Amino acid sequence: MQKGNIGVTTENIFPVIKKFLYSDHEIFLREMVSNAVDASQKMKTLAEKGDFKGELGDLTVRVSLDEKEGTLTISDRGIGMTEEEIDKYINQIAFSGVNDFLEKYKDNANNIIGHFGLGFYSSFMVSKKVDIITKSYKDGAKAVKWSCDGSPAYEIDDAERESRGTDIVLHIDDDCKEFLEKSTIQGLLNKYCKFMPVPVAFGKKTEWKDGKDVETDEDNIINNVEPLWTKTPSTLKDEDYKSFYRTLYPMQDEPLFWIHLNVDYPFNLTGILYFPRIKSNIELQRNKIQLYCNQVFVTDQVEGIVPDFLTLLHGVIDSPDIPLNVSRSYLQSDRDVKKIATYITKKVSDRLQSIFKEDRKGFEEKWDDLKIFINYGMLSEESFYDRAKDFALMKDTEGKYFTFDEYRTLIKDNQTDKDGNLIYLYSTNKEEQYSYIETAKAKGYSVLLMDGELDVPTASMLEQKLEKSHFTRVDSDIIERIIVKEDAKKESLEADKKEHLSTVFTTQLPKLDKAEIYVDVESMGEQAQPVVITQSEYMRRMKDMSRLQAGMSFYAQMPDSYNLVLNSDHPLIKKVLDDCESNTAEALKPIESEIKGQEARLAALRQAQDKKKPEEITQEEKDDVKNTEKAIEDEKNKKRDVFANYAKGNSIVHQLIDLALLQNGMLKGAALDKFLKRSIELIK
């Protein structure tokens, strides 16, 4: 028996390994099985090169549990190790067998990852003791057993083993007993090893017999050694890709289409990326791309390897050229990664472009599922926008699709305002905003449907990209003020009458939670509705953006602001105005007379003060101005009360307000019930 210390630069490296080297303890199993697979592949390479003349035999890697003994064993029939190799590759932690091996077989080493390196020591994250029982493939080699309890001290002794290969026996630590459970190991093997290039067996298959599961003699192989991405695309059919997608994502809807990646210069990259059906909720779609290194699962956190918007895709990327840290769990940013990201982005945009050109109708049919992905890409990657602007689509409220250039050409003549700005009208809900859409269409305008999660941010982006272009929701104002065709015409209603109308309706507006409503009076034509509610495009857009972007919570806290616009040309509004003036004239006469008198007095007082220096104005004069201002305000409040008392009993005023609120989904609860009862009374 030989004893010694592992060649490490610190006396206690194992606590470091256990706590800090690997982010997830569970990946020890990936490292162990990966090492076994590597050793098996090396054995196969030696046989192919003629450096091993014996029987290759079954190269299956086997994982087994012994709950009674508290051990987990990973066995292979690979190249094994001699005592000298154990001393070099295991005891001297700074060396790795992969360097010697790759140097010898560098011209034929595409599928070789390595043998024992730091990955082996991940076993101590879950083990109180590790045994290696190994026998080299070399003629005359003896079996050797290496044991270590997690300290730098180790023991090497002779062992009994008939065939070449290695058994790694992990004596599972007391605080890691979950790794002695069959379901846990099965789950980890499915996660990390399901596409490894050498068969991996865990127990035996079972069959249902006599009312229970019974083990058969057939190995339970957990992996597919030739996953779809390793095959030549020309040999595959659509059903092959769909079937593989179902293997990866059993509960997902069928993908729209896919891209088979296959490049060997200037970097190695294979894989299949699927376009899923993305309706909403971007965050739920992320982390569906699985990253592999020579068919060994590394991570599904691929933000560092592909642009952010591509994380919405599903599928597999496999590359030995993506740099990993010692734990193989976190990506490092370097030139190769950037090249790979650029390549993938180009392949994705090329695929979308080709589908658009070859099958425009099919592309349009898929647009609702593709839209959020393409919009996200244009918002987050300038290079993707430059490509996508030629195939990204706009959809109008009639269900017709247009490219950016096509739609601009369509609306250019009719929707350019007097200042030369091209106005893109849009709706976020064509049912709720139906009347606004119809009003716009009556003037010959086209209205886009922008009801997706990222449509409004995309509109903001396009305003920056497209010269003199503005996107405005169709209910943000009356249509005459959204697309102003000529200078404002002379008002058809005198200022005092507009004020009377405004006050009548303002006094009867309901108090809404976190919302303010202002009344406006406009000449809109007899055929237009008597009253509509609009909301500022700017404030609504800022509030929408605040839900998607951090740092904009200020807008989210602000109350909603609406305009109740009265159409002074409509017969109902004229009727309210005429009725109001005839019913309030007597009460208003003395009030308005008093207001005029007080306003004239205030003007005289201010004119007198304007001739003096500030220090020459007496306190009495200041108080006189203040008292006169208060007197005017008191009279205006009386005037307001007169209008309020009139409006309170006017069912038409209340009905018009409620109709406008109802049209915008703002009439609810008791107010809605009151409206219904009033409507019935008016019908009688």
Task: Identify what each model region corresponds to.
Residues M1-L180, G187, K194, A585, ...:
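GHKL (Bergerat-fold) ATPase N-terminal catalytic module, capturing the glycine-rich phosphate-binding loop
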Residues I112, V130-A153, D173-K177, S183-K684:
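GHKL/Bergerat-fold ATPase module in large chromosome/replication-associated machines
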